[in-house]
């Protein structure tokens, strides 16, 4: 609670300190002709009233004549947003006498509709639970605060409370700011587009890591390496890379590259002799010309394509792009599979974009620790800092200009045209 004290000079009160009220509260202070101020007294059982359905263009001085006819006013406060300063359409009213509050409630509550409002005015006792039932305590050292948490958290139930005492460290300004923005986004029925854009990529990445782990474990134990498993893992990485670039990737099926090419009769796979290869892989029987059988190289019945001209496009090479990173896991017999396939498509860097004229915002007083992610999260309820229409930009300015972060308030305004000669 902050108390404003009147200053005294030469034994007389300084009326200048009483005439100005920076908080916007209007109370019942009266001034005698001699300059001395009389502080009003209120009953010990005075009622604090909540006033709702007030036009947003009416301030304390406009509302005071309406309520003064029921008695002397002790305090009248119009509620405004602490960050934007916007009128909330409600107020708190306290009379000096309890009877005045009861008369005002009986005469006004849902009995009179103020100009510009669709519903009648609400006059009722303020909720005593509006304080939130919480408080902040600041210690001189972190150790003292930790000792208080250890001693008091959950140790007792205060009189009138329904649960035990909760003592914990308060959120930082940055955490509170992010939570308020998330709540605002939820109230506006909005969602995070980043989760939609990269949700599929997260699933692909998780499946890719699991597939890689299974392949490496199989090779380490000397087991058989199925080329189709390697192709499936390469497919996941290929689709993940394409999704990150915003491209649609069609999944590869086992029949796309594993079936026999048209016009080729699948010969019988020769019998495999006893293991003589490396890491437990079986040897490959040699043909008369000294070359290994194609069927043994491409196991599981995957057959090679016939020789083509250098200019002809190989559909197998296009379908299995991105398998080269798995070459280290293959034995020598499988090395030529990865050599024929190119690298996956690189990530396409996103260039900085600007919206149309009148839709770009310039923001002052951002904390140094705020990056693109925090800035994006703050302005997600409005689209982003650059909008595609002036109406969204104006809505963001009205809601975010003056928003407090830490010890400073944001200053949000339209970006000046490029031909303006004045700096920001």
Swiss-Prot record:
Keyword vocabulary terms for this entry: Cytoplasm, mRNA processing, Nucleus, Repeat, RNA-binding
Domain RRM as annotated: residue spans: 47-128, 342-417
InterPro entries referenced in this protein's UniProt entry, alphabetically: CELF3/4/5/6_RRM1, Nucleotide-bd_a/b_plait_sf, RBD_domain_sf, RRM_dom
Lineage top rank: taxon: Eukaryota
Feature: compositional bias, Polar residues: 9-24
Keyword presence, Zinc: no
Region listing for Disordered, in residue ranges: 8-27
Single GO BP term: mRNA processing
Location relative to the cell: Nucleus; Cytoplasm
GO molecular function: RNA binding
Chain segments annotated as transmembrane: none
CC annotations in GO: cytoplasm; nucleus
Keyword match Transmembrane: no
One Pfam family per UniProt: RRM_1
UniProt similarity note: Belongs to the CELF/BRUNOL family.
Known function: RNA-binding protein that may be implicated in the regulation of pre-mRNA alternative splicing.
Protein's name according to its UniProt entry: CUGBP Elav-like family member 4
